[in-house]
A protein has these predicted regions:
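Short cysteine-rich clusters marking metal-coordination/redox-active sites
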Residues: 73-76, 89-92
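Cys/His-enriched microdomains
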Residues: 71, 87, 105
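Short loop/turn motifs enriched for small/polar and acidic residues
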Residues: 32-36, 65-69, 110
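Short metal-binding segments enriched for Cys and/or His
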Residues: 97-109
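Short functional micro-motifs and their immediate structural scaffolds
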Residues: 81, 94-98
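Short, flexible, mixed-charge glycine/proline-rich loop motifs
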Residues: 61-68, 78-83
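Long, charged N-terminal interaction/targeting segments
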Residues: 1-60
Length: 113
């Protein structure tokens, strides 16, 4: 379960941002995860809740938004969203594609007071 290490990293980023902004309490952490990142949002939320106990993020809400998978075709150089890992370019049919977005996991922003 890599959600535990991701939750730890998310918590560290949120705590640092809150401290730099002079906030005492984190209310919401907004996270973006790629559709092919393998992140299970409910597991990530459970891990974040567990790891944030006793910190300014205790009780904070974790809002996870899934980012669609975007690939660039190496043949026609167009970008497209795909839903399957075995997809080809929807424009030219080439299987020569490179993922641009879809595996990321990052803190987009936080709400704190």
């Amino acid at each position: 379960m890599h959600e535990l290490s991701l939750a730890q990293g998310i918590l560290q980023v949120a705590l640092k941002a809150a401290q730099q902004g002079g906030a005492e309490r984190i209310m919401t952490v907004y996270v973006k995860t790629g559709a092919f990142s393998g992140v299970v949002p409910s597991y990530l939320d459970e891990c974040f809740t567990l790891m944030s106990k006793g910190t300014p993020a205790e009780g904070a809400t974790l809002e996870v938004e899934e980012v669609p998978v975007v690939v660039r075709c190496l043949e026609c150089e167009r970008e497209s969203q795909i839903e399957r890992a075995d997809a080809c370019c929807p424009h030219c049919g080439s299987s020569q594609i490179r993922m641009v977005h879809g595996r990321e996991c990052f803190v987009d922003r936080i709400e704190a007071e």
